[in-house]
Amino acid sequence: MKKLCMLTAAALALMLLAGCSAQEEETEPLPESMDQETVLAAGEEILNQLLDGEYEAVYGEFREDIRADLTVESVQELIESETQEAGTYEGIEKADTIGSTEGEEHGIARFLCNFSEEDVAINLAFDPDMELIGLSAGVQTSGWSFSDLTGNLSGLFGG
C-alpha cells in the first residue's frame, strides 16, 4: 500500500510538472510593434460589441482579406453558439495578451468572461497594424477535477 501511495504521488507530480511546462511553451510575447495596453483596449471594444449583439460592426472591424471569407451571420453564430447557454453576462474575470507567429505575426487579446451559468473564453487576434484578423470563443471548462484525476490514475495502475 505504501508503494502504491508513493507511485501515485510521483505520477501526480509528473503530470503537474508536464502541464506547467506545456503551458509555458505555448505562449509567445507580443510582436515588438505591439503593446499590451493597446491590444487589450482594442480587444475589449470588440468584445463589448460582440456582447451587445453588434455583429455587423464587428464584421466591419475585420481586415479586408479576412472579411472576404466571413459573413455577419458566421460571426453571430460563433458567439451565440458559445454564449447562449452560458447565462447572463457578468463581467471579465481575466484579461491578458499573447503573441503568435503562426501564419503571420500577431497579438491576441484573451478574455475570460463570467456568465451566470458558465465562463466563456473569447480571443481576438490583431495584426501589427491593429486590424482584427481572428476571433474564437469557447466555454471554459475546468482543466482539473478530482474525478478526472482518479480516473487517469486508475488507468495507470490497470484499475
Which residue stretches match the model-derived regions?
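Exposed beta-sheet edge and beta->alpha loop/turn motif
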Residues: 96-159
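Primarily extracytoplasmic ectodomains and periplasmic/lumenal surface modules that are beta-strand-rich
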Residues: 55-56, 131
